[in-house]
Amino acid sequence: MAAKGGGGGGGGVGTLKSTSINGVKLYSVTGKNYVAPWVLAKKKRSLRKDAEYQRRLELIHDLRFETATTRIKVTPDGQYVIASGIYPPQMKVFELKELSMKFERHMISEIIDFEVLGDDYSKLAFLCADRSVCLHAKYGSHYSVRIPRMGRDLAYDCWSCDLLCAASSSDLYRINLEQGRFLASLSSQSPAINVVTRSMIHGLVACGGEDGAVECFDMRRKSSVGRINTASSSEDVDQEVTSLQFDENQGYLLAVGSSVGKVRFIICYVLII
């Protein structure tokens, strides 16, 4: 099971209410601030200003996998949570309004990463451990294609309909979902690409390499517009870039996570024209 915490105002993290009987703790799954589905919408709107209600903690039932959960993402419309896990390899979709599982699907191979291609769960792309990229629709598996090298990360450029696949190669593979075919790859100077991300503000694509470098691509020109080595000292020479994230306000700040556990921030507005 997973917890869904309320947003809003100032504060602390919600906790599950519990009582103890003969030394055995009993937890209230819904908590005292649970609002039944039949409560009037007007009443629910008034609760938005209730700080205690906003800090409530509710459980999403059945959000678990036999061995481990590998990825969790929320759909852009905020209505669904999609999770992948092992073993066996599978994905599950949960509806937040009902706090329960909507459906699950079993996969042939372990899911390395996945992307939500639309506003909800109706269009999904899965990068799997057997080098396959599996496209799913509401009714299930739609199409599958293999990339040349082992995939490591996935990103989607909604402006060009390009699905970007980072792999154990210097090439960033491009699958155009509108044309249904591979396009010319974006070539990086790194020997292999660990992670790829895209800014929702200006569309710049950033790749993190095994050599500790971050390289940015302009999807309009389909070429590199800048590259920087994130190693700040001789102690960081062997580090790899393992995580990237643009800020969601202006897109000028890029957070870079490394294999040695350090997080650095890069200002990249000079790359945006």
Task: Label the predicted regions.
Residues T30-R56, I86:
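Blade/loop signatures of beta-propeller domains
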Residues R45-T67, E95-F103:
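A short helix->beta-strand "capping" segment at the edge of beta-propeller domains
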Residues D62-E66, E104-I108, S144-R149, L186-Q189, ...:
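Surface loop/turn motifs at the tips and blade-to-blade linkers of beta-strand repeat domains
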Residues A68-K73, S109-V116, R149-D157, P191-R198, ...:
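Canonical WD40 repeat/beta-propeller blade segments in eukaryotic WD-repeat proteins
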Residues Q79-I82, D120-A125, Y143-S144, R152-D153, ...:
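Structural hallmark of WD40 beta-propellers
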Residues G85-Y87, L127-D130, A166-S169, G208-D211, ...:
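Conserved strand-to-loop turn within each blade of WD40 beta-propeller repeats
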Residues K92, V133-C134, Y173, E215, ...:
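WD40 beta-propeller blade core
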Residues L96-L99, A137-G140, L177-G180, M219-K222, ...:
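Short loop/turn segments that connect beta-strands within beta-propeller blades
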